[in-house]
Amino acid sequence: MGDRVEALAIFRKKQGVLSIDSRLKWTGEGKTTPSVDIAFDAISNLQTTPASNPKVMIRVFIVVKEGEDPTSLVFHFTGTPNARENCDMITNELRNAIQRQREGSQSKPQGANVDRVNSTNLEKDIDLQESLLTNNPDLLQTFKEAVMKGHLSNEQFWSTRLHLLRAHAVERSQQRGPYNVLSTIKPKTVDNQMKVSLTGQQIHDMFEQHPLLRKVYDKHVPPLAEGEFWSRFFLSKLCKKLRGDRITPMDPSDDIMDKYLKDNEEVTKVSDEPIASHLFDLEGNDQNANVIAELRPDITMRIDKEALPFMKNINQLSERLLEKSLGNSKRFNNENEETYLKESGFHDLEEEASDSKVVLKIKGQDQLLENNFVPSKNQVGLEPLPSLEALQHLYQEDSISLNHIEHDSDSLAEAAMQLTQSMREKHEFETHGTASNLPIDIKNEIVLCHTVTIEFLHQFWNALLNTTFPDKKAMAPLQNALLNSKKRVEAIASQAQEQNVDPKLVYELVSCTLTSIDTSISEYQRRMSYPPA
């Protein structure tokens, strides 16, 4: 926000000062607290009189509550010194402040709104619902049958799927972080020729993650064709180095790519870490002592010179990916500096802080401890609790052993047979229809009818159990939807009969669903037969 701007203005026939800093304020003459204090995001419109009008005033429209008409506040500058100049100054500064406020609110990431989504916003977010239906074909089919055919309203359908909408909103707000693109590209050999498929985004990411590759590309393309360059690169030792793979003597040589094997890919930059003093630079002192004394580490502790370049390359790539994800924030540098200062201090030489505890002294403490404890009258006649040995002796005879349990082999065999038969029937229905070779189109119709009917039953019982006495207007469409489901089952049975399939098979598969429909309608009619209390 800019500097504070203020000017004399009249509000409701009272003289005062109109000021703009972080908010729009008007303070009456002789008062310290502002009578008008308005946030910039509450201002919906701004009007001012033209220069030809002798009256100089500003009309500010503010929104007190969402959905209500804006309220106007009028500030007059007529009769004050430099009225027109002050009016223009206040108007321009107020417009700039409102513009900055709106730009700041729009620049916030969309992911921050995910935590604030509630049930009402989810049910009204049509774009989110369309995205979820596009990604879930089964849910889309159910939506078409239940909502688009007029059986359920859009709010009823989504009221039972708020968890799906909320999870999808969180999924959409997440952004994919950077990854090692080069390791995901796998060239293929077709007709003794290597083929590689690259997109523009992949090439851009590789150049951003590997500055050395961008340097080689800019230097040799042209004269090399782009296809030839990428074919030679993916077969070269340079590609294996950037990937972090070990280079072997069997790898083919390339007179262009091999010249860059010893080049360091790390970009030179100014280090944010302070230079360590020789007084407590343990790593530097250790290296210096080894050089002077000509000491070499044990063979198990020596660095593998062949693996060292690959380790450095992978570490540098990981560092670049992290910097891109974190935005190279200075906050981490400040944390590292504070940690460095804490670790470099000689804390063992600091004076110990004195304990500021309060010592509690009791007069006559010895006399209190020497007095014999005399039980009260209520405690004299009580018997002590039995000992643990006495309790164990009481329950020693009736001990329980979990190793000897009576098994009903017939019941176990029957349960296992029923479970196996159920799993076999489910597998046969999902793969081949039924044992009687039910056509696949009939099977799909049955599955869809069952799914939609379950949705109707869910909504039906939610509305029925929501109140003590059901609402006829709300229950009538749901009852009709259940009755239409029974008619649809009859239509599927007729369709099966036309294809020389026994209709009894269809009724057997949906028998539980039909029973649920009859039970629901009977319960609704039973409740409607009782008058409301």
From Swiss-Prot:
Domain of life: Eukaryota
Any one Gene Ontology molecular-function term assigned to this protein's record: RNA polymerase II general transcription initiation factor activity
Main location: nucleus
Location within or outside the cell: Nucleus
GO-annotated cellular components: cytoplasm; cytosol; nucleotide-excision repair factor 3 complex; transcription factor TFIIH core complex; transcription factor TFIIH holo complex
Every BSD domain range: 116-169, 190-241
Chain intervals with Polar residues compositional bias: 106-119
PROSITE patterns assigned to the protein according to its UniProt record, in alphabetical order: BSD
SUPFAM superfamilies xref list: BSD domain-like (SSF140383), PH domain-like (SSF50729)
Keywords tagged on the record: Nucleus, Repeat, Transcription, Transcription regulation
GO biological process: DNA repair; nucleotide-excision repair; transcription by RNA polymerase I; transcription by RNA polymerase II; transcription initiation at RNA polymerase II promoter
Residue numbers spanned by region Disordered: 100-119
SUBUNIT field: Component of the 7-subunit TFIIH core complex composed of XPB/ptr8, XPD/rad15, ssl1, tfb1, tfb2, tfb4 and tfb5, which is active in NER. The core complex associates with the 3-subunit CTD-kinase module TFIIK composed of mcs2/cyclin H, mcs6/cdk7 and pmh1/tfb3 to form the 10-subunit holoenzyme (holo-TFIIH) active in transcription.
PANTHER family referenced in this protein's UniProt entry, alphabetically: TRANSCRIPTION INITIATION FACTOR IIH-RELATED
Protein task: Component of the general transcription and DNA repair factor IIH (TFIIH) core complex, which is involved in general and transcription-coupled nucleotide excision repair (NER) of damaged DNA and, when complexed to TFIIK, in RNA transcription by RNA polymerase II. In NER, TFIIH acts by opening DNA around the lesion to allow the excision of the damaged oligonucleotide and its replacement by a new DNA fragment. In transcription, TFIIH has an essential role in transcription initiation.
Family listed: Belongs to the TFB1 family.
Name of the featured protein: General transcription and DNA repair factor IIH subunit tfb1
GN (gene name): tfb1
